[in-house]
Curated annotation (Swiss-Prot):
The gene is rpmB. HAMAP family: Ribosomal_bL28 (MF_00373). GO terms for molecular function: structural constituent of ribosome. InterPro entries: Bacterial_rp_bL28 (IPR050096), Ribosomal_bL28 (IPR026569), Ribosomal_bL28/bL31-like_sf (IPR034704), Ribosomal_bL28_bact-type (IPR001383), Ribosomal_bL28_sf (IPR037147). PANTHER family: 50S RIBOSOMAL PROTEIN L28, LARGE RIBOSOMAL SUBUNIT PROTEIN BL28A. Pfam families: Ribosomal_L28. One of its GO terms (cellular component) is ribonucleoprotein complex. GO terms for biological process: translation. Belongs to the bacterial ribosomal protein bL28 family. This is Large ribosomal subunit protein bL28. Keywords: Ribonucleoprotein, Ribosomal protein.
Amino acid sequence: MSRKCEICGKGPSTGNNVSHANNKTRTTWYPNLQKVKAKAANGSVSTIKVCTRCIRSGSVTKAL
């Protein structure tokens, strides 16, 4: 199970945390993924991992 959105493909991004003393430590930021029961095009229901941006934009049709 990867940490990727199944709709847009958004995944982890990396960079540095920078302190006031300009010390740098590597870090990883993960997308806010939610497990959602969604309807597919053929009408079947499956659980997928979706980022909150895709949920808010209406890219996912939730199954009720």
